[in-house]
Amino acid sequence: MKKGKILALAGVALLATGVLAACSNSTSNSSNSSSSGADQVFNYIYEVDPENLNYLISSKAATTDLTANLIDGLLENDNYGNLVPSMAEDWTVSKDGLTYTYTLRKDAKWYTSDGEEYADVKAQDFVAGLKYAADNKSETLYLVQSSIKGLDDYVNGKTKDFSSVGVKAVDDHTVQYTLNEPESFWNSKTTMGILYPVNEEFLKSKGDKFAQSADPTSLLYNGPFLLKSITSKSSIEFAKNPNYWDKDNVHVSDVKLTYFDGQDQGKPAEQFAKGALSAARLAPTSATFSKVEKEFKDNIVYTPQDSTSYLVGVNIDRQAYNHTAKSSDAQKSSTKKALMNKDFRQALSFAFDRTAYASQVNGKEGATKMLRNLYIPPTFVQADGKSFGELVKEKVASYGDEWKDVNFDDAQDGLYNKEKAKAEFAKAKKALQEEGVEFPIHLDMPVDQTATAKVQRVQSLKQSIESSLGTDNVVVDIHQMKTDDVLNITYYAASAAEEDWDISDNVGWSPDYQDPSTYLEIIKPGGENTKTFLGFDGKENAAAEQVGLKEYAKLVDEAAAEKTDVNKRYEKYATAQAWLTDSALLIPTTSRTGRPVLTKIVPFTAPFAWSGAKGRDMASYKYLKLQDKAVTAKEYQKAQEKWNKERAESNKKAQEELEKHVK
């Protein structure tokens, strides 16, 4: 059997082995010298308070961006994107790709928030973590429920015996997982919180007080930092764990995050200039930006685009109307019927000027640098030498002429087209009038009133859609609301019944692991995120069936069933993405990064990852180094060129070494 076939069956893969060569990120290695002597403190901002610190349960970035710095799992990402040892000092996978065995390091400990040693980290802690997640219906169960043998039966109550689930502590320092099918991306899942350990004794002692958002003592820590304090809408502070097993790779002594409500867009740059922040996102549309440009003309750096995709979601099953401009049931019914019509949704997508939208954040010159035209980034994976975006372009063309000349590359607006918008709307209007729909269609869109750039973005969206389609046809009704009120009807809504909007740009996704399924699985009927993305929940939903999501789910399942041929697998996922693109149920807008910043982070020293929780830009602090002065654009470019070359070599070497893990 050829080595390549063994590795495919064994289910091991790097970050898609060279697939990402066309992409880079703002985090990793550099030759720049960092400041020395005094302790380094990383000062930055945060924008959303965490609901809790429960890394085993929460899928919210507001939680995981914090806990990934406090808790270590089996593996983590280095500054080149390789998966390297963390709690596991070594691992093996069986030749059939079904059994992963991890050998834990013996110097790993649990510590209290005061830094006092509590216990050794043992294999049973990983078993306890998964059991707790299953028993408490973790928001991230979708990551592993169908992967780990017996877990689905346990979650669905077919068995109450957790020992039948494919995770076991072979001994104190060996944990083993048995999968249902090979997964080439399994190891990348180990960076996610649901597969982190928890000390069972501590967990029981805390009960329902475990992992409370404002209580650092409600957690144990085995990671690089200890949480010192959280004050809602004020600050979050970490301190370096002085006894951490890998403390030599923790270069900052403290992390201090200050709450930013987004109202004064120029404030981060002002704080950076005063030395109060280590890095600052810039707002080219702010009144003070010309001053920033003058003072830091050589230091403005645009971070490369990452794998986080932001979108406009369409609520296909709205139930709440506490925040609406609609004055009658007829208007509510008309909007619902319009949003169920694919031609109408496509008209919205083609009518939306994303460049103008992004310019509210990046300014006119930098607007295109953050644009995204596909839910899954076009370079996320490739098959037979073609990027994922190229595969989708080929497949979506079969849905209609409107797609034949669309460019899905990043950093340009391949979708905005007034003529196409009008043509699709004309088709939609004819069909909707036959259904008795009243025009104009009113679309309620909530926005945080304190976040100036967010308000300006949705105002831009309103302007371009209404300009393209006419206010006699479509009116976007913007609802400016308090921060918590917006979050409670979008991001933090407990159920679809509380999703009180027609269209929303409070929608985004960062991939959990290195496979297209991480994007596509979550919006199948029954998926955890259908309420936030599309306004419905449950597997059997009439609206979801009406818009064709059962067909979509079938395409995703067909791709997931391809376990041995990666090229065929990605081709099939491209087919599913093509269906989703044509449906216009999700309208892509931007990536998370691709924005202008000022920074004292030594370029490319922080961990890098296209997926998982251990390499988020500006949110992963292990490895990160600081320098005394702001990085110049010239320094950054030189460091990036060096890092790209080193990363390619490092990834290649890591890929070659995978064979030794197959036993």
UniProtKB/Swiss-Prot annotation:
InterPro entries: Peptide/Ni-bd, SBP_5, SBP_5_CS, SBP_5_dom
A Pfam short name: SBP_bac_5
GO molecular function, one term: peptide transmembrane transporter activity
UniProt key word Cell membrane: yes
Membrane topology qualifier: Lipid-anchor
Signal sequence annotation: 1-22
Stated family: Belongs to the bacterial solute-binding protein 5 family.
Protein name as it appears in the record: Oligopeptide-binding protein SarA
